[in-house]
Amino acid sequence: DDAFKWLEADTGSYDVIIIDLPDPTNYSLGKLYTTAFYSLVEQRLAGAGLMVVQTTSPLYARESFWTVARTIEAVGLTVHPYHALVPSFGDWGYLIASHRPYRPPTRLPAELDGKLRFLTPDVLPGLFVFPADMQRVPAEVNRLDNQVLVQTFEREWGRVTPE
């Protein structure tokens, strides 16, 4: 199903929304990264709810990553970025968004201690720290009428991916 159409038809309210979309490699997919799309998501997110968005690499596609963050902020949500090493992708970025300010966890719940392979008490705080080459850069808001993310994504990944 088309996520955009589904959100337009849905009237529910959700405590957690997890968004894992295909890369914005064309305008049809790019519309899923616009203020129009995230406005629909914002309307479905409960007052104390959290939305998590898988974005792109803040290292290799830095401007694209921050364009998504800026776009979500433009619809009135607070964004808290984080990143993690994903073996098949490298350093990958995510965004937590909410209506209210979000404070990232500083420790793992006791019931998870020693039970996770990657996420450890030492790794957790580093997820929310961005080194200089991944920190926020100025970025445009991605809208249906400009689709800046599609061009930015293509330009940035074109530098990394051989043809």
Predicted regions: what they are:
Residues F4, A9, T78-E163:
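Soluble small-group transferase modules, centered on the S-adenosyl donor enzyme superfamily
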